[in-house]
């Protein structure tokens, strides 16, 4: 009798295994849809805001800090860069430069994001950063479809993109 019971248990286990074989266990829970304030756009787990007011780099970053504790946008991947570029282009702006959060605070050509994120992805335009005419703050340029970076003087006034968690 015990042998028959073991036989049925073995058959049951084999049937279960054959039914579940080839199915991957769900390891990630679906992400909740992020809700961003009106006038901003969501990408992954952040909200983005394009402001056409022209400010210096410092004033633009302060504006972003006062707006939901954000910063000028840190572009951490090529995909995020493409999203930011489309956000700027969709605005219909005629600006040639748009501030992002990359800067060289010690003027030693070591770049930092104002958000504190690590600089691992880079998208410098041709000839940038410049050694001939160095700037210590970074903008996206319209000539590259707002996808490439250029170092420019921090005192210049450009529109800008903020990035923040909601």
From Swiss-Prot:
Might act as an inhibitor of spontaneous calcium carbonate precipitation. May be associated with neuronal sprouting in brain, and with brain and pancreas regeneration. It is found in: Secreted. This is Lithostathine-1-alpha. GO terms for cellular component: extracellular exosome; extracellular space. Disulfide bonds join 36-47, 64-162, 137-154. Residues 34-164 form the C-type lectin domain. Glycans are attached at residue 27. InterPro entries: C-type_lectin-like, C-type_lectin-like/link_sf, C-type_lectin/snaclec_domain, C-type_lectin_CS, CTDL_fold. It comes from Homo sapiens. GO terms for molecular function: growth factor activity; molecular function inhibitor activity; oligosaccharide binding; peptidoglycan binding; signaling receptor activity. Keywords: Disulfide bond, Glycoprotein, Lectin, Pyrrolidone carboxylic acid, Secreted, Signal. The gene is REG1A. GO terms for biological process: antimicrobial humoral immune response mediated by antimicrobial peptide; positive regulation of cell population proliferation; response to peptide hormone. It comes from the Eukaryota. The modification Pyrrolidone carboxylic acid is found at residue 23. The composition of the O-linked carbohydrate on Thr-27 is complex and varied. In the crystallographic structure, the attached sugar appears to be N-acetylglucosamine, typical of an intracellular protein, rather than N-acetylgalactosamine. Residues 1-22 form the signal peptide. Gene3D superfamilies: Mannose-Binding Protein A, subunit A (3.10.100.10). In pancreatic acinar cells and, in lower levels, in brain. Enhanced expression of PSP-related transcripts and intraneuronal accumulation of PSP-like proteins is found in brain from Alzheimer disease and Down syndrome patients.
């Amino acid at each position: 009798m015990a042998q028959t019971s073991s036989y049925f248990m073995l058959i049951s286990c084999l049937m279960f295994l054959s039914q579940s074989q080839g199915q991957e266990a769900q390891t990630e829970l679906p992400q909740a849809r992020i809700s961003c304030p009106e006038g901003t756009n969501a990408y992954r787990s952040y909200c983005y805001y394009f402001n056409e007011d022209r400010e210096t780099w410092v004033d633009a970053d302060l504006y972003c800090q006062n707006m939901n504790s954000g910063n000028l946008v840190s572009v951490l991947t090529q995909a995020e860069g493409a999203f930011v570029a489309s956000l700027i282009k969709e605005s219909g702006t005629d600006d040639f430069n748009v501030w992002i959060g990359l800067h060289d605070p010690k003027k030693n050509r070591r770049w930092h994001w104002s958000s504190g994120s690590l600089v691992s992805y880079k998208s410098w335009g041709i000839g940038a950063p410049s050694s001939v005419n160095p700037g210590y703050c970074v903008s996206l340029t319209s000539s590259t479809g707002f996808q490439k970076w250029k170092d420019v003087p921090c005192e210049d006034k450009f529109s800008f993109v903020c990035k923040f968690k909601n």
